[in-house]
Structure formats: C-alpha cells, structure tokens
C-alpha cells in the first residue's frame, strides 16, 4: 500500500508541471514575444490580464459548464472560439491550434493566439478579467521594477 501511495505522488508530481511565471519574468518574456504595444495594448495591461486570468500559470484551465467550453493557459483562451480541444460543441478554432499547446511552459503559441484574439474588434475587452481588474486602472505596477 505504501508503494502505491508513493507511486501516486510521483505520478501526480509528473502531471502537474505548469510553469508559474514571476511577474517580471513574464513581462520580459511577453516583451520578447512582441506583445508590448501590440494592437495598442501596453505590456502592463498584458501582465495584468495574465495575473487575473491565470495567476501567471501556464497550465491553468477553467471549465465553463454553460457552453461546455474550457479556458486554457496563461491567458485563459477559450475552446469555444479560439482553440481545439476536441470536446467543445460548435467550436470555431480561430487560432488553428490545439488547446493543449496553450498549456506549454513555452508560451509562444499562447502569445500568438492572444495576438489573434486581440486583433478582433473586441480587442483586449474580450477578456472579462481584464475588464474587471485592469481596464481604467493604473496598471503600471505590473511592470514596475522589471526593466522593460
């Protein structure tokens, strides 16, 4: 029985591998990936968005029972419109990407899809967490001291 418990803990530690970025580490990464000022959205707004959507966690997921969709990754990109998880009824997959790609520690795919999302008419307002926590707020604190 003890061996099964240890095996279970080992398997659990293997499956929970999401990277949780430090604030400044994320700011520098997003800047390198071209998000600073992309479609007029400041780097501070992107970092604020990631803070409130996922807590900077690349492996965050959130199931939405109302429309049977799931939000994925550091930006909580939704499977109804943006990615394909093979489960969401009527999914559009506008980013032409597997939702699992949005859970990688390397966030290049997530950033590419976020650029696609923000290019739509709704822009960054597509994210509820941004509207609730970042819009019309002083978001400079999210990049303060980061050297970006």
Swiss-Prot record:
GO molecular function: lysozyme activity
Any single Gene Ontology cellular-component annotation: extracellular region
Catalytic activity: Hydrolysis of (1->4)-beta-linkages between N-acetylmuramic acid and N-acetyl-D-glucosamine residues in a peptidoglycan and between N-acetyl-D-glucosamine residues in chitodextrins
Keyword Secreted: yes
Signal sequence coordinates: 1-18
Compartmental location: Secreted
The protein's Enzyme Commission number: 3.2.1.17
Miscellaneous information on this protein: Lysozyme C is capable of both hydrolysis and transglycosylation; it also shows a slight esterase activity. It acts rapidly on both peptide-substituted and unsubstituted peptidoglycan, and slowly on chitin oligosaccharides.
Function of the protein: Lysozymes have primarily a bacteriolytic function; those in tissues and body fluids are associated with the monocyte-macrophage system and enhance the activity of immunoagents. Also plays a role in digestion in this species.
Oligomeric form and interacting partners: Monomer.
Designated name of the protein: Lysozyme C
Protein's gene: LYZ
